[in-house]
Amino acid sequence: MSENTVMPIVRVAVLAAGDDGGRLTEMALPSELPLREILPAVQRIVQPARENDGAADPAAAPNPVRLSLAPIGGAPFSLDATLDTVGVVDGDLLALQAVPSGPPAPRIVEDIADAAVIFSEARRRQWGPTHIARGAALALIGLILVGTGLSVAHRVITGDLLGQFIVSGIALATVIAALAVRNRSAVLATSLAVTALVPVAAAFALGVPGDFGAPNVLLAAAGVAAWSLISMAGSPDDRGIAVFTATAVTGVGVLLVAGAASLWVISSDVIGCALVLLGLIVTVQAAQLSAMWARFPLPVIPAPGDPTPAARPLSVLADLPRRVRVSQAHQTGVIAAGVLLGVAGSVALVSSANASPWAWYIVVAAAAGAALRARVWDSAACKAWLLGHSYLLAVALLVAFVIGDRYQAALWALAALAVLVLVWIVAALNPKIASPDTYSLPMRRMVGFLATGLDASLIPVMALLVGLFSLVLDR
């Protein structure tokens, strides 16, 4: 048997319409290849580019016309069919015509095995330039993170300034790259901008000489907040706006507390209470802050007797859907920042071995208040962050206790985490328990009163814990 396989062919005549009445071309075409693969060559043969009018490849046009072969007076063949499948034989006359707009015709298969392969998800999502670009972006992000980690470790362990210079260069290069690709690829720009938060924070934190302390945290928080505000102003992606809002608000909160710790000597109780209080304020004011950042047009309500104000321009009304999306993204970011500040403050309050019982009350009340506050929000992202407050806190305390060699406390944190998971499982098996509509009106009022009482009790307990009452009484 010969080593070369002979490809079956069919000899046909192809008619292509044109201004001069059409052009008939005889050609030999492979009969077992899909039309999708042979049509580009057929199109180049029967419709050559004209020299005078500079016509280019129709596939390169802004809205290319999809062409296919068809019998004279018949419907175009499916692009996934072969000439053998549709019954084309030697001597047939075919026409090259446009595929009508609308949903594509069902693919033609010859047996069940072919159908299983053709209609599988793996065949529909084959490897292509998009996957290559995505892999390159992931590789670049991984390189940035690995380089940042290595530089920080080198600076901390050896004390050499080389690590500081390298991490500063990585931060600068990442920031420039994120700004450079903003107009070309919004997704890549957002990914690089989010990744740049890590080297920026590391570069600013390592910029303060001496032992690590409040000044390092102050400078790192300032860098993160500044870069977040810059990225948030130019981010076209709603998810990017939410992320940068969360990092900006968290950075500003940590900046205020770290600034106070740099100026005065304050205890961990004061730091924790300040972070929890900032998180509570941010969460309560999330709706107002998000509306302000989205720049909603303020309503003009005339006084009695005043003339009716003019209607809003159509451009403002047409821009309202975009502003609503931006407001929702800001709202999600503000809620996330409030949860992160509350968790950080709770860890600062009870991570030490001699934590006060009042500190534990603040931690539990803040977590319970966040869970009860989730009933107010309709957004799934906001609910997820508020309900995840307790889980983030349990995991953070578990890690802190293990690092501090407090394994008994870590077991208690693990038990609390198991109880929280059990609550989720019960709610998943009985959805009515987690639905507020199934509760009576008196029960809803009781839950609202409990949530208000927990929030109102936090500030007096914080004042008692930090010694404000003792300071006033001693004077």
Curated annotation (Swiss-Prot):
Pfam families found in the cross-reference section: YukD
Membrane topology: Multi-pass membrane protein
Segments crossing the lipid bilayer: 132-152, 161-181, 186-206, 212-232, 241-261, 264-284, 333-353, 354-374, 384-404, 409-429, 453-473
Effects seen without this gene: Deletion of the gene impairs iron-bound mycobactin utilization and EsxG and EsxH export.
Cell location: Cell inner membrane
Predominant location category: membrane
Source superkingdom: Bacteria
GO CC terms in record: plasma membrane
Keyword vocabulary terms for this entry: Cell inner membrane, Cell membrane, Membrane, Transmembrane, Transmembrane helix, Transport
InterPro entries with a match to the protein in the record: T7SS_EccD (IPR006707), YukD-like (IPR024962)
Entry similarity comment: Belongs to the EccD/Snm4 family.
Subunit structure: Part of the ESX-3 / type VII secretion system (T7SS), which is composed of cytosolic and membrane components. The ESX-3 membrane complex is composed of EccB3, EccC3, EccD3 and EccE3.
Function: Part of the ESX-3 specialized secretion system, which is required for siderophore-mediated iron acquisition and for the secretion of EsxH and EsxG.
Name of this chain's protein: ESX-3 secretion system protein EccD3
Protein's organism: Mycolicibacterium smegmatis (strain ATCC 700084 / mc(2)155)
Lineage summary: Bacteria, Bacillati, Actinomycetota, Actinomycetes, Mycobacteriales
